[in-house]
Amino acid sequence: MSKFVRDIMKIGVPTCEMETSLAEIAKIMARENADAVVVMDEVGSCGVVSQSDLVRAYPRNYDLLTAKDVMTAKVLTVPPDAAATAVAHMMMDEHVHQVFVLHEHPGAGKPSAVVTMRAIVREMAGLEPERPQPPLKRK
């Protein structure tokens, strides 16, 4: 049975602003268990900071750098009804590890979900998609 983006996507995408420090972005990624953070400006999504971008910046005064200094300006997006196999091809062709799913209503510039290589591997293994866990309640 063919799977679609909506079947394997992880709902929720961490975001930051252009001036967010790389140290703060690293904290967001760690807290959200995310491979990337979408950079937002006043119109919508304008870039992506990936784990690779952070690691590449680590030796070069990363504590002085912000999202705009290291982000990839291209945010690849797909619709929820795209075939998972087509998305896998796109990711390989574009040399990216994730693509983002935009809100289904027109004019929304903020991604609502993400498809990662990990999600595709989980699908290949016959595992359920990763879903965000509710926060633990402290007693």
Regions picked out by a protein language model, each given a short descriptive name:
Residues 2-10, 14-24, 28, 32, ...:
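The feature marks the first
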Residues 29-32, 37-52, 91, 99-119:
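A glycine-centered beta-loop-beta connector
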